[in-house]
UniProtKB/Swiss-Prot annotation:
Its cofactor is Fe(2+). This is Peptide deformylase. Coiled coil: none annotated. InterPro entries: Peptide_deformylase, Peptide_deformylase_sf. Transmembrane segments: none annotated. GO terms for molecular function: metal ion binding; peptide deformylase activity. The active site is at 130. Removes the formyl group from the N-terminal Met of newly synthesized proteins. Requires at least a dipeptide for an efficient rate of reaction. N-terminal L-methionine is a prerequisite for activity but the enzyme has broad specificity at other positions. It holds the Pfam family Pep_deformylase. It comes from Thermotoga petrophila (strain ATCC BAA-488 / DSM 13995 / JCM 10881 / RKU-1). Its EC number is 3.5.1.88. Fe cation binds at residues 87, 129, 133. It is an enzyme of class 3 (hydrolase).
Amino acid sequence: MYRIRVFGDPVLRKRAKPVTKFDDNLEKTIERMIETMYHYDGVGLAAPQVGISQRFFVMDVGNGPVAVINPEILEIDPETEVAEEGCLSFPEIFVEIERSKRIKVRYQNTKGEYVEEVLEGYAARVFQHEFDHLNGVLIIDRISPAKRLLLRKKLMDIARTVKR
C-alpha cells in the first residue's frame, strides 16, 4: 500500500510525464494503487498522489477498477453541474466544484492499447478530477478565492503534516 501525498507536497503541483513503459512494474504499481484507493475508501487515485509523477490514475465508480494511462479529454460537453468533491490529498475537506456532465476521452490500458469512450455524470466527474491531478491542478484551484480563504487554516494544518 502507498502513503497518500497531501496538500503541500510538491509532487502534487507538477505536470506528470507520459508513461512510456507498459510492463510488469506498471501493472504492480497499478494493483498497489487500487489497493490503496480501496483502503482509503476512494473512487479515484492519481499517480502523483502516491509520489509518482507519471500520467496515470485508477478509478472505480461502481463497475470495478479501471487503469487510465496517458489520458486525453477529446471533447467536453458545455453543459455542467456543480457537486461536492473530496480528495484523498485533502483529508476532511469537501468543496463544491463545477464540471462538465459529459466528456469524450481516450487513454491507454495496461497493455498500451487505446480505449476511447464517452463518460457521463459521476464517471465524468471522477475522470476530470483525476485528470486534473496529472496536470498539477488541485480541487482548491477550482474554487473561489473567498472559499479558499475560508479553508486556509485547514489547508495549513494539512500542509504541516508533509514530510520534507
